[in-house]
A protein has these predicted regions:
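Long, C-terminal-biased catalytic regions of enzyme "large/alpha" subunits
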Residues: 1-134
């Protein structure tokens, strides 16, 4: 669908200020999330992690930083490995059964979904997301 202001096709979720595929810094995303204060709800800052936090302390400090900047709603999203037995884990080998990772999953609206079950458009959208290493 053509955006009336931009005059071109511009895909964005209704609960975000910056598209997930936009090549911008995580700080720009955080600053944009301050606009959520002017909404009645339904807006959320998605931080797509290219890798997990190195420690609990790193995750905690970053989360406190978001709160101190006035971000109301946010979600850390990272790819999760899945083996053929449908166990989810991080890494190359399943921590439950020892089988290798054969698929990736990602949280979509609060639940885990396998990438290989995505429709073409969702696969494309996921490939275009800007991922961050924090």
């Amino acid at each position: 669908k053509i955006d009336k202001v931009l005059g071109k096709d511009y895909y964005i979720y209704g609960n975000q200020w910056i598209p997930l595929k936009e090549n911008t810094s995580v700080l720009n995303r955080i600053d944009a999330a301050k606009l959520d204060n002017f909404c009645g709800g339904g807006a959320i800052l998605h931080i797509n992690l290219g890798e997990n936090f190195n420690s609990f302390e790193d995750a905690w400090n970053f989360t406190v930083g978001l709160a101190n900047k006035g971000v109301k709603y946010f979600s850390y999203i990272s790819l999760i490995d899945i083996c053929d037995n449908d166990h989810s884990f991080f890494g190359d080998t399943c921590t439950v059964c020892g089988e290798p990772s054969t698929s990736k999953g990602i949280k979509i609206v609060g639940y885990l979904v396998k990438q290989n079950s995505f429709k073409k458009q969702r696969k494309q959208e996921l490939e275009e997301r800007q991922m961050y290493s924090l």
